[in-house]
Amino acid sequence: IYWMFTKIFYKYSSSIAVVADNGQKLTYAELGEMVAAKAATFTPYVLQFCLCENNLESLVFYLACLDAKAPVVMLDAKKDAELLDHLRNIYRPGETICHEDLAVCLTTSGSTGSPKLVRLTLDNLRSNALSIAEYLHIDEHERAITMLPMYYSYGLSIINSHLIKGATLLLTDKTYA
């Protein structure tokens, strides 16, 4: 991926990148191939919606958007259909041309209780991932469980900070009380 993961896919090519809920394991090389194939279906700078679940499909979609320079709005796959239609009408995914620096939009309720989008650049994502990885001493021996949704900033930062260091992600939507 042009902004930070390409060399990681090669450097850790034989290491396990992802373990899915169903037990499926992917190496960094395999994940990189899936991401490249999906990225080829996107147009640079054209907005995409990712209806997120903590699964392989959503992870590949997110990474492919970054690879293709296609800004992505990360949304809860279980969002109310009426709200999703409203967001589609406003933002027109697949049609809207975005600024070249825009990488990801995350929803926040803000102070009004209605969804707002926070815009993040590639530099924002990279510096956040590297800062977290450095502070927590994350390396290729770490394994992170995706307990938080990837459409949350904290959930996404866990993904980015672990992938950038060649660690393993354990993808799950399960919650434990």
Residue ranges and their predicted role:
Residues 1-16, 97-103:
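A short N-terminal helical cap/helix-turn-helix that marks the beginning
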Residues 5-7, 56-74, 133-134, 153-165:
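Hydrophobic alpha-helical segments in the ANL/AMP-binding
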Residues 27, 103-130:
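Conserved AMP-binding A3 loop
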Residues 34, 52-53, 73-87, 167-177:
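ATP-dependent adenylate-forming carboxylate-activation enzymes
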Residues 39-78, 147:
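Conserved AMP-binding/adenylate-forming
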Residues 65, 108-111, 144, 150:
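Conserved S/T- and glycine-rich ATP-binding loop of Class I adenylate-forming
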Residues 126-143, 153-177:
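Conserved AMP-binding/adenylation subdomain of ANL enzymes
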